[in-house]
Amino acid sequence: MSQSPSVIDDILAEYQGLEMQLSDPELHNDPAAARKVGKRFSELQPIIQTHQKLEQAREDQEAASEMASEDKEFAEEAKRLEEEISELEEQLTDLLAPRDPHDGDDIVMEIKSGAGGEEAALFAGELARMYQRYAERHGFSTEILGLNETDLGGVKDMTLSIRSKQPSRDGAWSEFKFEGGVHRVQRIPVTESQGRIQTSAAGVLVYPEPDEVEDVHIDDKDIRVDVYRSSGKGGQGVNTTDSAVRITHLPTNIVVTCQKERSQIQNRARAMQVLAARLQQLKEEEAEAEAAEGRAAQIRTMDRSERIRTYNFPESRVSDHRIGYKANNLDSVLDGDLEALLAALKEADRARRLEAED
């Protein structure tokens, strides 16, 4: 399975051009431009590295084959290299395949408690901590933009920004894009005196936040801006002055909040960035109706009957209903150990995409 030389040559030329740009001190005077170039460089780097390994393996295999008739060890080496070449060709094919254009992007995640009252809010808080732990262990930075808590420390709603610390081919969107939907929990609530198992739900919405939000114009007449005092408790890393901002986009009824910054002006600017990202995603989904299915069909209702995943405490089981995934490691999952689950979701998505191409 060989790749078109012209495709590789074009990528190599672009890669070398980006490398030259990154070595230019002038570029780094513009952080946004430097980040854009760095991100594209990181997207191409695995392709170049895999191609170079493949070319070297082919050369080594050819040399070993020529010596195989004289030395048995070279025959074994030639066979091993054939297998390595096959693996590298498959890797290169995957790297060159069309990919989600947002995979390198940062994200904004909204977590809202649903059916289940205080217990649902406590569960929403556990989901938030789960995502924060996973993100921070995997080199992402997290920032709470908005937080509305209950008296018991549960989360009514939270807006969380998850960003790559360095430009990367695989950004936060590639990791978290399958988490949007309704998450259901089955357990005995701390608020339940009779010891009965109850079902509660929390909703998660994930959307990419590209470096550049294209073609999104927001008229001042289309938004309502409210200023309020945040409800974050001490230690939550959010501002508690009267500078928190809530922006409602009237045509779509989308609401975004930001209370992280110390000034109303800064919070408004950050909230407008988030709103632009939301509207960009909405525009893409309307232009491409199948996008919602392609992104694992995020469920925007809080109805606990429509769920993507169930967290069953009595049996310590996590079940993802979209792909039939089950694992009895609930405690570690809620502690942020999501590697196996996310890998299974990515592989199922890859299989669907390959099937669609056939």
Curated annotation (Swiss-Prot):
InterPro entries: PCRF, Pep_chain_release_fac_I, Pep_chain_release_fac_I_sf, Prokaryotic/Mito_RF, RF-1. Its main location: cytoplasm. Pfam families: PCRF, RF-1. It comes from the Bacteria. Keywords: Cytoplasm, Methylation, Protein biosynthesis. The gene is prfA. Belongs to the prokaryotic/mitochondrial release factor family. This is Peptide chain release factor 1. The lineage of its organism: Bacteria, Bacillati, Actinomycetota, Actinomycetes, Mycobacteriales. PROSITE patterns: RF_PROK_I (PS00745). SMART domains: PCRF (SM00937). Residues 51-79 are annotated as: Disordered.
